[in-house]
């Protein structure tokens, strides 16, 4: 049985709004907000590159679309609520960026003696790192949401791009984790795959 959803409205909020954040909706973006019977908000952001949907639920926090803005409001005023409002605002801004520009992480394959070979199976949603540290069994990293997250290998450079920042970031983290070397001195054994750039910001 399908769960009922309804469009949230400011007038239906039980209490007085004491704090709010707003996100300007871009011209080429459509944002839909619905609320389930359990009060969880479902936010769908659609743009030229696709659409992303996320759920939000925090007590005393309310979301709705007002004209060309998303309003994120709270009926309590404290540091925690302020942080939650800021976090949701950042999520929605990242969702807008994803469906208009996309998100991109860059990684570097580092090795000293054994040149690994990185193979991407986009359909299967896996990345295979063969001959890593001379190992016979390939190491495997999962591509999160492979239909919308792409992994590209260009020599020792690896690019992860997609519309969902969380999926892109987690895929990059999976690649790092897959080549983690246990019980070895990292000052000596620096082989691995490392994130070097996140959405244009270099990692020192």
From Swiss-Prot:
Quaternary structure, from the entry: Part of the 50S ribosomal subunit.
Keywords for this protein: Ribonucleoprotein, Ribosomal protein, RNA-binding, rRNA-binding
UniProt superkingdom: Archaea
PROSITE patterns found in the cross-reference section: RIBOSOMAL_L6_2
General function of this protein: This protein binds to the 23S rRNA, and is important in its secondary structure. It is located near the subunit interface in the base of the L7/L12 stalk, and near the tRNA binding site of the peptidyltransferase center.
Gene Ontology cellular component list: cytosolic large ribosomal subunit
Protein name: Large ribosomal subunit protein uL6
GO molecular function: rRNA binding; structural constituent of ribosome
InterPro entries for this protein: Ribosomal_uL6-like, Ribosomal_uL6-like_a/b-dom_sf, Ribosomal_uL6_a/b-dom, Ribosomal_uL6_arc, Ribosomal_uL6_CS2
Family as reported in the entry's similarity comment: Belongs to the universal ribosomal protein uL6 family.
GO terms, biological process: cytoplasmic translation
